[in-house]
């Protein structure tokens, strides 16, 4: 019992001491309220960046707009980042490929070159087609009849030639996109690049996602009548995942500083390993088609079917043989069969000669043949009847 009494006495002594200590500490506190405001509590509990991440853009705009009520200066919201492009975007706008010289007589020209195997770039005038090797320089001449206004630009863009592929954007294949063959200025997915120019701009349209390269227009140098721009094509026409053997067109446009069209011209392009060979082959096929199927006059219908066919030329008929042969046949049935076959062949020859205008001579020939066949028939019958009668 003495131990319990001692413990109770200790508690009774400690309680007043603890109360006095707490009251003394409470008096030492400042009179102002140290509790933070509701806005400060929100900042302590959740940072603004994390709050925007969880609440979304609408909530983030609402939270950021709260302190703006106290500030008389209104803050404009920042620009919204565009959505990333799909790997193979489709364009809703197809550029025109029709030639338009405009007020400045804008048109293209190319250097004359042959079809040797060693040539790296060659142009075919009848096909209006450029044959070149991968990543080889192709000079293109810009001709004008009058000087364009200051600040004019030249744009080059590639599109697919066939109507079923026109809406698709022309770009390099995945293999060549990963190749480190650029100078860092051109994006890896761009097909056309410019060589020998200090101010090329590689652009991608935000709406159509089409690639183009733009350079400032420079007037011809002294003693020259045209301006030359050197282009390169960074993917083969046969690459899978890229052009995939689909023909393409390169559209060259002359624009002013505001982007208004001043002139347009285009040409077909084939990027291959042997440009001279491919040009020679395609020109030969083009000439054969012109001989077999000539072009329709301008006033005729566009969808009219060609009258010519690609059938082989008719074979020349051999002249009839004028010699006669005698054939001895044993048995009447066999003789009648050969006789009918011979008459059918003679009748066929008679029709053939009538078409060539020699029907009279052949009709007399047919009569003589029939007379000889009947006389031979009588002779053979006499020979057969002779032994039987004996």
From Swiss-Prot:
Stretches for region Interaction with CCAR2: 4-317
GO BP annotation list: apoptotic process; B cell lineage commitment; bone marrow development; cardiac muscle cell apoptotic process; cardiac septum morphogenesis; cell population proliferation; cellular response to actinomycin D; cellular response to gamma radiation
Cofactor or coenzyme needed: Zn(2+)
Compartments where found: Cytoplasm; Nucleus; Nucleus, PML body; Endoplasmic reticulum
Linked residues for Glycyl lysine isopeptide (Lys-Gly) (interchain with G-Cter in SUMO): 383
Region: Required for interaction with ZNF385A, residue numbers: 97-297
Binding-site residues, Zn(2+): 173, 176, 235, 239
Stretches for region Interaction with HIPK1: 97-367
Protein name in UniProt: Cellular tumor antigen p53
Organism annotation: Mus musculus
Gene name of the record: Tp53
